[in-house]
């Protein structure tokens, strides 16, 4: 398997979202057959996706638990079909260890765990055994389940991770501190299971049980993840707080209209530009071409010292 050395020197990588679910908030039901999913995978790769993130269970507000075997039946045939014809990096979006094991054996490279190894006590061991890379997400829904922004989400994890006393203390923490309280627990689990540090990426959990203000504050905190020595895996594409911001600014956001749908992706791409200007390693997105352009601008800012001193007369 791989380690995070594939991140070095490549700039920000684009991770294309491929949901093989009937109920995901953006593309649910579109790619539930292997043929449809494979066709979309080819399209994403052709457009420039360097990673494909394949999910078999929706995590949107109001979604429902998917049984382990059903989730395996959704993702594994798609992973096998993609792997037959491409060496693209494949991430499986799951918090269940049995799904992760089946996906890794089918050819996946990365486990994208929205519970940060805390939802399934066997997950970290599976990742270590397969020498896979992992994305550990800060999950505010698990960290403060009684918060109004959390109660609209499904329950993540097989059993409670934090005691009621811990949850009471965590409920008082500023969101930036809460993120690190959660990550400290996740990273301790990873270390205990033997997952190598250089195989771990951290995801600040944008859009999961957070207020608009908290989402924005966490985006301001991206640098602290780098300061701790971890690469960042960021997912902001089509998140509700993004839509809310541009809606309040007077822009059309109704996804049933062509303009509204476009504006959602355009606004998301602006955040990709900001993120890449801060050196974020991976962005998880729906629209690859739009985010590819945005990332090229952000990356140019991040690598300003390496830019050529092209004068005005030399511009094309």
Where is each model-derived feature located?
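Conserved, mostly hydrophobic/aromatic
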Residues: 18, 44, 48, 93, ...
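Glycine-rich, proline-tolerant flexible connector loops at the mouths of alpha/beta enzymes
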Residues: 24-26, 50-77, 205-212
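Glycine-rich anion/phosphate-binding loops
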Residues: 26-43, 70-73, 116-118, 176-183
